């Protein structure tokens, strides 16, 4: 990419900044927030957060070739220009947008946020747009899709950093795309990873109990999600038009708050209240869901291939977003009927075993509840659930999830899920205590098995023909964290290895963990 002058990066910089040396005609070849990645001609943005403070690595960045630095500390005497700002993350977002020549201003940007269902809904919208002939791209917590190219966006689930997001948007624009669906997490919003993304359409799935370890309270978590909707009013005028539309879930507890936050246009969807996009007469079976769609004067019976009644709500949100993006009604309905499953979301693993095996990403109390309710719809026999709860995260969540599982599953197996530096034994003890208080009986209706592979094996051993075994919490993720180390792990690989062992099939190996 052609270098951009440092002075040009600050031409439309919307937040206060100060420097002893005005940004001049210094060519900037790249922007980095990790000093280890810096190369000659780069701008280094020092970010404080977590266990690392980027300001401690300014000298290293300069020695690697940084020609300018942005940070929040009062620093003098550097051999390169230093620009001080109040928030380095916010600055990084605006600088990245300017570096890539503000690609979001030339695209229709559809943001999807929520606690549960946002990856599925984002993929639904993307698939409907593509099938309708819209030149669309996707940035999710699983991958970025740019034309025929699919880019992995990382091991764990969150929105990519601002430089990566703006880079993806730039590549999409260069590839001739006109629309992008951007899955947007609360961390992505709170940490300004999606600042300067110029949202045109904002969609919420739901806002329930999650990430309170980071946000502190539900209200703060909800406020972080709300930033996307508040930002609609600031979206610049675009050649493609300015929908500036909020799509809200009338059935969710977040509705009143978000409806009050949105200053412009908004539409609603739901199953429990009369809304702009309404569904009734829902039926579900292992092959998908059927419902009657009532919207825009239309009453139409719709089929979706994704199982679970919860997906009806996702369908409504996706349909509303597609219509807002200009897709004709008939094409949007046809798109719903052709949707494919999302990796790691109620994903069936089929190897000829006499029972159902599912891998799902459910890692919150509400998502686990929905996953187990869906599992109940998929079998008339028993449901056996294998899952854990992450370390160094909201501790209340692990108790709530254990309670949900002993109430909805016939057998629950508590196991590792990214314990990080927290004691796995303590996490499992908390889950077992909550399960016991909820009426569970250890050794009969629930078990503790530290090693996740062994836990999945136990689940398989306990199944009978017609049962359903579901492993929740990891979904598409490709690693698990013990201590500070990420170990390769994929629940789908582990499930296949387990089934292969049972069926006597060669060629499958269980991933190894420190607990193995």
Whereabouts are the PLM-identified features?
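ATP-dependent carboxylate-amine ligase
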Residues: 1-17, 40-43, 53, 123, ...
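Residue-level signal for inorganic ion chemistry
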Residues: 9, 42, 61, 95, ...
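Receiver (REC) domain switch/active-site residues of two-component response regulators
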Residues: 67, 200, 410
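Non-catalytic positions within long, well-ordered alpha-helices that form the structural scaffold/packing
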Residues: 58-63, 173, 195, 376
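Phosphate-binding loop of NTP-binding sites
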Residues: 13, 92-246, 256-262, 379, ...
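Acidic, Mg2+-coordinating active-site environments of NTP-dependent enzymes
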Residues: 71-79, 198-357, 434-435, 439-440, ...
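Short secondary-structure boundary segments
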Residues: 71-74, 184, 206, 416, ...
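N-terminal leader/targeting and accessory segments in enzymes
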Residues: 1-94, 98, 278-280, 299, ...
């Amino acid at each position: 990419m052609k270098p951009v002058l440092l002075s040009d990066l600050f031409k439309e910089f919307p937040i206060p900044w100060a420097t002893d040396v005005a940004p001049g005609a210094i060519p900037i070849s790249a922007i980095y927030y990790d000093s280890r990645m810096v190369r000659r001609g780069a701008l280094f943005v020092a970010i404080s957060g977590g266990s690392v403070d980027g300001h401690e690595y300014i000298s290293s960045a300069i020695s690697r070739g940084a020609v300018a630095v942005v940070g929040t500390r009062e620093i003098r005497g550097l051999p390169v220009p230093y620009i001080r700002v109040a928030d380095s993350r916010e600055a990084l977002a605006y600088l990245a947008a300017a570096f890539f020549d503000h690609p979001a201003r030339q695209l229709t940007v559809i943001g999807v946020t929520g606690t549960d269902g946002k990856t599925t809904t984002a993929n639904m919208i993307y698939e409907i747009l593509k099938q309708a002939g819209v030149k669309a791209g996707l940035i999710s917590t699983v991958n970025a899709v740019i034309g025929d190219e699919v880019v992995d966006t990382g091991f764990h689930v969150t929105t990519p950093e601002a430089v990566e997001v703006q880079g993806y948007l730039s590549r999409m624009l260069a590839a001739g795309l006109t629309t992008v669906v951007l899955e947007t997490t609360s961390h992505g919003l709170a940490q300004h990873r999606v600042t300067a993304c110029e949202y045109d359409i904002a969609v919420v799935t739901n806002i329930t109990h999650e990430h309170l370890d980071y946000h502190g309270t539900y209200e703060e978590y909800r406020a972080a999600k709300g930033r996307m909707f508040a930002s609609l009013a600031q979206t610049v005028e675009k050649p493609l038009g300015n929908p500036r539309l909020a799509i809200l879930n009338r059935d969710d507890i977040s509705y009143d708050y978000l409806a009050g936050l949105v200053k412009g246009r908004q539409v609603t969807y739901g199953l429990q209240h009369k809304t702009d996009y309404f569904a009734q007469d829902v039926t579900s079976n292992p092959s998908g869901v059927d419902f009657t769609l009532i919207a825009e004067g239309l009453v139409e019976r719709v089929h979706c291939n994704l199982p679970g009644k919860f997906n009806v709500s996702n369908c409504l949100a996706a349909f509303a977003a597609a219509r807002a993006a200009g897709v004709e009604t008939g094409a949007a309905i046809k798109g719903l009927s052709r949707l494919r499953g999302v990796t790691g979301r109620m994903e069936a693993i089929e190897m000829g075993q006499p029972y159902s095996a599912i891998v799902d990403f459910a890692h919150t109390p509400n998502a686990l509840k929905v996953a187990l309710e869906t599992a109940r719809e998929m079998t008339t026999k028993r449901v056996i659930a294998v899952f854990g709860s992450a370390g160094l995260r909201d501790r209340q969540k692990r108790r709530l999830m254990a309670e949900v599982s002993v109430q909805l599953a016939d057998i629950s197996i508590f196991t590792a899920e990214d314990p990080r530096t927290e004691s796995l034994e303590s996490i499992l003890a908390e889950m077992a205590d909550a399960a016991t208080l909820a009426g569970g009986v250890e050794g009969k209706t629930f078990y503790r098995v530290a090693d996740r592979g062994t836990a999945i094996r136990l689940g398989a051993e306990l199944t009978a023909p017609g049962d359903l075994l579901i492993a929740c919490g990891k979904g598409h993720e490709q690693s698990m964290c013990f201590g500070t180390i990420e170990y390769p792990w994929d629940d789908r690989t582990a499930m296949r290895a387990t089934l292969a062992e049972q069926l006597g099939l060669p060629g499958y190996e269980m991933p190894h963990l420190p607990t193995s």
